[in-house]
């Protein structure tokens, strides 16, 4: 029996990340090689023509799994009946802009998109926020879509997680698929804490801790962390454009693991609503190590946290509290 198509919304679909993401979804990379999809692409009116061009290309690519394309600038049409929503659209910070100006633009975008999703998305729609500030945009969306369960609203830190895996893989000259269980704690910003204390590498003699194999704590506690934290900026410097291919790929990884489950013994990083685990204040969307099964994520419990890690985890939580306060001040 062929599966029923899943409706996937991509906002900001005419942009760089959208252009990288929609073919991945249409090829089955996000939801599996046997899962038909109907793509809903939403963008702002000035991007309508470009959006239509992307729709033409999707049709021209003749993807067997793609059962329909909705390209629209109307939020109601874009959100109607969607099972998965990937929120890529947002207002990027431009030179000379104050943080508060950017925040207030994004607060109004996410407030209105929350309302459209709440009214028109399919029940149990899973939402992934990619646009920056991702954690706080997701928090605003949660506030203004109270009927969407909080466990269904997440933000993307899988890009940071994958960047951390990539750095370890390069350092040890091993395939990235042999590295697992790095953790990104906190905000998707340069205050995030990439933690390798629980990470493992598959070797010919079984799994070994990353620290044991790298044998260079100064690198792991210094350059490794700053490289992962600053990677987005490094890519902008090199490409003159922000990372799109890697962001799109990690968004697919995030949704795929969430819907289809994480491999046994592996955890991944997701920005989710804090329940107070690891003494992270509740009321924030914070990146935690999670496992997924049957379409639900759970925070990995009981990992030992040393004093150095604790400080870094608290620091990024502080930044998230500040962002939250700033966002709420834009609402009043």
Swiss-Prot record:
Any single GO CC term annotated in Swiss-Prot or TrEMBL for this entry: chloroplast
Q: Which residues carry this modification: Methionine sulfoxide?
A: 56, 97
According to its UniProt entry, this protein's organism is Arabidopsis thaliana
Q: Which Gene3D superfamilies match?
A: Lactate dehydrogenase/glycoside hydrolase, family 4, C-terminal (3.90.110.10), NAD(P)-binding Rossmann-like Domain (3.40.50.720)
Regulation of activity: what does the record state?
Answer: Decreased activity upon treatment with hydrogen peroxide.
Q: What domain of life does the UniProt record list for this protein's source?
A: Eukaryota
Q: Which residues form a coiled coil?
A: none
One Pfam family linked to the record: Ldh_1_N
* Protein name in the entry: Malate dehydrogenase 1, cytoplasmic
Q: EC no.?
A: 1.1.1.37
Keywords for this protein: Cytoplasm, Disulfide bond, Isopeptide bond, NAD, Oxidation, Oxidoreductase, Tricarboxylic acid cycle, Ubl conjugation
**Which reaction(s) does its UniProt entry say it catalyses?**
(S)-malate + NAD(+) = oxaloacetate + NADH + H(+)
The primary site where this protein sits is: cytoplasm
Q: Which InterPro entries match?
A: L-lactate/malate_DH, Lactate/malate_DH_C, Lactate/malate_DH_N, Lactate_DH/Glyco_Ohase_4_C, Malate_DH_AS, Malate_DH_NAD-dep_euk, Malate_DH_type2, NAD(P)-bd_dom_sf
Q: Which family does it belong to?
A: Belongs to the LDH/MDH superfamily. MDH type 2 family.
List where in the cell it is found: Cytoplasm
Q: What does this protein do?
A: Catalyzes a reversible NAD-dependent dehydrogenase reaction involved in central metabolism and redox homeostasis between organellar compartments.
According to its UniProt record, which residues of this chain constitute the active site? 188 (proton acceptor)
